[in-house]
């Protein structure tokens, strides 16, 4: 299966996380080692400014069984579609001006906008939102907000959608990203979604935690 970065084509090598630590002779030394390892893991979520100027970017699959790749008429967006009406979409956007610090509040704001947009285009929408760590970067989980939604589309069909959203208000280049899997309810597949997520990663993540 192939994959492409939304910011630049080609291979992108990341740093492997080093979980090893030397044995310590005291409890205080062991605590210090644990803290160092924790910081090392966070540091491994490094930034490559050649991609998106250092903004968070997606590594997105260009091939997946039963799906075809298409470039959306929207900067920083890519999509896979299938013959059943399914869409798998990744987007990334930079803030036009520095936002107020606070990833959680900014992520909630973008999530609310997504919900309002779907509600405006559909009927009977039901949804729930919770924190999620299913998306990874450099092998480490990235805390995001996941919304599961059900609604009736303009075509009268029942649909299910899952969207992951995360805002990054600080760091090299603040912005926000989203990943959406939406299909008619009859063709929604948890197994298929899991396979697609395994090929979809975030890069240029400086902080994985969804802090206040």
Indicate residue ranges for each PLM-predicted region.
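Short, well-ordered beta-strand elements
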Residues: 92, 174-184
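N-terminal targeting sequences that direct proteins away from the cytosol to non-cytosolic compartments
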Residues: 1-82, 183-212
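Active-site beta-strand termini and strand-to-loop segments that position acidic
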Residues: 80-84, 147-150, 168-171
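A short acidic-to-branched-hydrophobic micro-motif
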Residues: 81-109
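Second-shell loop/turn segments in exported
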Residues: 97-105, 131, 182-187
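Signature of long, low-cysteine stretches enriched in small and polar/charged residues
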Residues: 116-167
